[in-house]
UniProtKB/Swiss-Prot annotation:
Protein source organism: Anaplasma phagocytophilum (strain HZ)
Alphabetized PANTHER family for the sequence: 4-DIPHOSPHOCYTIDYL-2-C-METHYL-D-ERYTHRITOL KINASE, CHLOROPLASTIC
Coiled coil: none
Annotated protein name in UniProt: 4-diphosphocytidyl-2-C-methyl-D-erythritol kinase
Enzyme class: transferase
UniProtKB keywords: ATP-binding, Isoprene biosynthesis, Kinase, Nucleotide-binding, Transferase
Amino acid sequence: MSKYFISAPAKINLFLHIVGKAPCGYHLIESVFAFVELYDVLEFDIGSRNRGIRFLKPSCINRRDNTIQRAIGHLVRRCSPGTTDNVYVKVLKNIPVSSGLAGGSADAAAAINLLSKLWGINEKETERVAFRVGSDVPVCLESKTAFVAGMGDVVELLEDSFLPRHVILVGPKVELSTKSVFDMYNPKAFSPSIGKLPGNSEDWLSLLKEARNDLTEVSVELVPEIRIILDVLGSLDGCCFSRMSGSGAMSFAIFEDENSAELATRYLRRNYPDWFIFKTRIIRSSDQEDNNMGNL
């Protein structure tokens, strides 16, 4: 039996524009995904007597029907009978469930990355499996800052050294179903495409500050506390911009310097003890390259 430990990072949507609807009914997006230092931790026992998923904290997640289980099922079906080992996964969930931070997608991507290597599944099939499991899973395979378009199947990695590092994640302690948000989303008109991506740091920062999350108003209608959180975040000293992530209910504020983020975190924890509040940092591509060099 072999053991593997993998950390799966949360994502935030620096913006999320809904630009249309595909014939199949899925919405078409344009978004920039960034990943932050908030992780689920997964322990994989390969070749165990047992198989299945165990969540180490109390959770509403179905042990028999979840993104990890679906990912494993799709991968097994792409292998010859008898060539795969039992897989038993223990999951320490730190990313809030149904929060707009793609915890389930990150966990599935961790399983896909590991098992596709162990079982010799090629890159093209790996990407197909990721998309079958969920629209956020393809970008989570790399867990690097990326422009994401279409139904989540178009992923373009971005140079991200210009991004401010410091982030505060804030949300009400409630779950908000992505499906319920999209079921209510019925705009008079979709957002226009941003067209050509910015070519320099200043233009990127300008776009990020002026952009939005098109799902915000629907999510606020379902969870009004999101509006209060966004108003509070936008008023914090040193905040570059704040926004809801994904379909909510988690929001974030971006700061240029750590001191401003620390002072804001203390203020929030003192005045809003009932909110989920987590100070973290954006993971830049250079961080991952440095880590990879350290593992050689």
